[in-house]
Amino acid sequence: MGSMSVWHWVIVAVVVMLLFGRGKVSELMGDVAKGIKAFKKGMADDETQPNTATSVPPVGPNDPVRTLPHQGAPGTAPQPPHVQPHVPAGDHKAV
């Protein structure tokens, strides 16, 4: 009683067909199929074309070590360190 039988799914399908019409459902399924085909084609293209722009050349044991300067997040300028101003001991004023 708790599980969905075949008849439940048949009734759901009939209600969907009545609400959306036969043409709309077939159009929607065609769009889904086109999307799946485009996804598979894109995945196949990625597998056949290795990305040579990001490939790193092999490093030998006698090659010099190259380092890159530290970079922050894109679009942010490096911030100078925050320094507290020095106030002499006798010159404290209430703000």
Swiss-Prot record:
Segments for region (Disordered): 42-95
Please give, as recorded in its UniProt entry, the membrane topology of this protein: Single-pass membrane protein
What InterPro entries does UniProt report for this protein, alphabetically?
Answer: TatA/B/E (IPR003369), TatA/E (IPR006312)
Q: Which GO terms describe its cellular component?
A: TAT protein transport complex
Q: Which residues cross the membrane?
A: 1-21
UniProt KW keywords: Cell inner membrane, Cell membrane, Membrane, Protein transport, Translocation, Transmembrane, Transmembrane helix, Transport
**Quick one: signal sequence residues?**
none
- Alphabetically, which GO biological process terms does the record hold? protein transport by the Tat complex
* Iron listed as a keyword: no
| UniProt keyword Calcium present | no
GO MF terms here are: protein transmembrane transporter activity
The family classification in the record reads: Belongs to the TatA/E family.
Among HAMAP family, the record links this protein to: TatA_E
Protein role: Part of the twin-arginine translocation (Tat) system that transports large folded proteins containing a characteristic twin-arginine motif in their signal peptide across membranes. TatA could form the protein-conducting channel of the Tat system.
PANTHER family in the record, alphabetically? SEC-INDEPENDENT PROTEIN TRANSLOCASE PROTEIN TATA
Q: Spell out the subunit comment.
A: The Tat system comprises two distinct complexes: a TatABC complex, containing multiple copies of TatA, TatB and TatC subunits, and a separate TatA complex, containing only TatA subunits. Substrates initially bind to the TatABC complex, which probably triggers association of the separate TatA complex to form the active translocon.
Q: Give the protein's recorded name.
A: Sec-independent protein translocase protein TatA
What species was this sequence derived from? Methylorubrum extorquens (strain PA1) (Methylobacterium extorquens)
Gene of this entry: tatA
